[in-house]
Amino acid sequence: MIEFLDLPDPPCFLDTESIKLKENIWIGNKEIYGIYYCEDELTNFLKHLFPECDNFKYQLLRNGIPKHVDVDRAINYNYILQAGGNNVETVWWDNGKELYRTCLPEKKWHKFNASIEHSIENIETERVGISVFKYDSNAGWWHYPDESR
């Protein structure tokens, strides 16, 4: 479900307040989640690091993210800039049963299985990270079972 990667740190990235000044392109509840395009310098670095990928974005998460499946991708490469609290946990689920729970460290690349239902719990402030993936046009959009679109 999670694999830590020994990859170089991004040479540049925006601070949280600068990210929030960008356009939030998320189509769902923008109070709890945001997606923002990375600037060109960071995108070029990420394209070199992940040549198979075509999406390079910042994510901003707040408390209240429901269990969900990222159905527009199977694998995500993430780099957490700000954890969002001291005990923020990523939890994977199978039919309501917990499979695995972990606290992901800041400033460490990881490969994340986004095709299994998961949740982000105990966010106290804002969780901010860089998210990289290959878009699957046949998969559709995020599925939040408890959120109407």
Model-derived segments and their meaning:
Residues 1, 67, 137:
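Nucleic-acid-interacting cores, centered on viral/eukaryotic replication and modification enzymes
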Residues 1-58:
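Non-heme Fe(II)/2-oxoglutarate
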Residues 6, 81, 132-134:
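Short beta-strand-to-loop capping motifs
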Residues 10, 82-85, 118, 136-138:
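Short loop/turn segments at secondary-structure transitions that flank enzyme active sites
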Residues 43, 48, 88-92, 141-145:
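Short, charged, solvent-exposed linker or helix-capping segments at domain edges/interfaces
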Residues 51-115, 128:
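Catalytic core of non-heme Fe(II) oxygenases with the double-stranded beta-helix
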Residues 93-95, 124-149:
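Double-stranded beta-helix
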